[in-house]
Amino acid sequence: MENSEKTEVVLLACGSFNPITNMHLRLFELAKDYMNGTGRYTVVKGIISPVGDAYKKKGLIPAYHRVIMAELATKNSKWVEVDTWESLQKEWKETLKVLRHHQEKLEASDCDHQQNSPTLERPGRKRKWTETQDSSQKKSLEPKTKAVPKVKLLCGADLLESFAVPNLWKSEDITQIVANYGLICVTRAGNDAQKFIYESDVLWKHRSNIHVVNEWIANDISSTKIRRALRRGQSIRYLVPDLVQEYIEKHNLYSSESEDRNAGVILAPLQRNTAEAKT
């Protein structure tokens, strides 16, 4: 299959990135290799979208620091970048809205590009054309329009399984995410994503739009474990990018005090969805 026939894909990873780890970066590489390897897709970009402070997750440090760490982690990447839109929102934004924002942004950019494209004219002397000839000639001179890349949600199996947590997700949001965008789920050791998809009617219905990527090289790094090591004064070298480690140490970001941030506060999606369910 030629590149022109492949669907271009943008991988979007939403999350706390508290802090970003080497595992987060590996998710992008694993997903890119898998999608390109199908012969049906070409991954053209990866986007890291840190959640805003309004998410109210326990131990979540300010978005300002999390964004900077993500930018430091992707400093040398040629295709993965950090987007701040979600992190700058005053209210927590559902993942569906973040996906929609980035898809609309791509479509708007493509529209602007087409409008600004120069009009091609037939060189040489003007002559009279029949309507059929004129239409055919114009068609051959017009540049081929390129399809807008499709945004797909990149995640780990833990996010996939969180769909089953009561009031954490709206059922209609889950349906739209898997039906209109799609998931690329990288599985960790001990997760059975395929079984979870089988046990969910919604996920099973749209299983063709859910790509499960097996991580054959075991990597159990997590932000939670990184924060725990930091609280205990243990080394995190080789678990996060060097620049991220330096930034954490310079600003003394993670401690017992920071882990108590938002303690006792209900997570934003649980608070909102529970309230809406009662109305």
From Swiss-Prot:
GO cellular component assignments: chromatin; nuclear body; nucleoplasm; nucleus
Sequence positions that bind ATP: G15, S16, F17, H24, K58, G156, A157, D158, T224, K225, I226, R227
Residue sites binding NAD(+) per the record: G15, S16, F17, M23, K57, W92, T95, G156, D158, L168, W169, E215, N219
Reaction catalysis annotation: beta-nicotinamide D-ribonucleotide + ATP + H(+) = diphosphate + NAD(+); nicotinate beta-D-ribonucleotide + ATP + H(+) = deamido-NAD(+) + diphosphate
Keyword check for Lipid metabolism: no
Cofactor binding: number and manner: Divalent metal cations. Zn(2+) confers higher activity as compared to Mg(2+).
Residue sites binding beta-nicotinamide D-ribonucleotide per the record: G15, S16, Y55, K57, W92, T95, L168, W169
Consequence of substituting N273D: In LCA9; results in significantly reduced enzymatic activity
Biological processes per GO annotation: ATP generation from poly-ADP-D-ribose; NAD biosynthetic process; negative regulation of apoptotic DNA fragmentation; negative regulation of DNA-templated transcription; negative regulation of neuron apoptotic process; neuron projection maintenance; nucleotide biosynthetic process; positive regulation of MAPK cascade
Outcome when changing R207W: In LCA9; results in significantly reduced enzymatic activity
Tissue expression as described in the entry: Widely expressed with highest levels in skeletal muscle, heart and kidney. Also expressed in the liver pancreas and placenta. Widely expressed throughout the brain.
Record: disease: Leber congenital amaurosis 9: A severe dystrophy of the retina, typically becoming evident in the first years of life. Visual function is usually poor and often accompanied by nystagmus, sluggish or near-absent pupillary responses, photophobia, high hyperopia and keratoconus. Spondyloepiphyseal dysplasia, sensorineural hearing loss, impaired intellectual development, and Leber congenital amaurosis: An autosomal recessive disorder characterized by early-onset retinal degeneration, sensorineural hearing loss, short stature due to spondyloepiphyseal dysplasia, and motor and intellectual delay. Brain imaging shows abnormalities including delayed myelination, leukoencephalopathy, and cerebellar hypoplasia.
Quaternary structure and interacting proteins, as annotated: Homohexamer. Interacts with ADPRT/PARP1.
Protein name: Nicotinamide/nicotinic acid mononucleotide adenylyltransferase 1
Organism: Homo sapiens
